[in-house]
Amino acid sequence: AQEYVKNDWAVISKRLQAIYALHFLTPYPKMMWQFGELGYDVSIEENGRTGRKPVRWNYFEDANRRALYDAMSKIISWRTDHEDYYGQNEVAVHTWSVGDGNMGGKTLVMDKVIVVANFNNAESTTTISNPNPGEWTNLLTGEKVQVGSSHTFTLGASDYIVLVRE
């Protein structure tokens, strides 16, 4: 078993971005805890479980926390802007592979969304079946990507990709 990185905010930020992409881009209502978009890391025990917690306004000054915020902003904005898609009674989720032991190949494949995440400390390759081959857009970079009906992604350690289709 590999040793997971627990104290490097560059790694933690990327993994949180991937987790939030997998979470917020699936159907049904979602909720986020205060400052969750910045990786709030104050213990629930601080000042008692229900006591006031410190506000960490300085989180915006940390580049990794800012990257987390920026990624979450794009992810949630895309979902909000596509309310017609998420508001359907049935949104087809073609693949949802997040519960297995393969930390390198977590995937979400829907008609308009593809998320592939690698939670390993090393590069990982994952192949997906895509029901909508053609041109997709990388949500975070704006880059256009051709994705076939069977497509292989190679992601670096703790990396992820979010592709969307209008």
Describe the predicted segments one by one.
Residues W9-S13, Q17, L22-M32, G36-E166:
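Carbohydrate-interacting/catalytic domains
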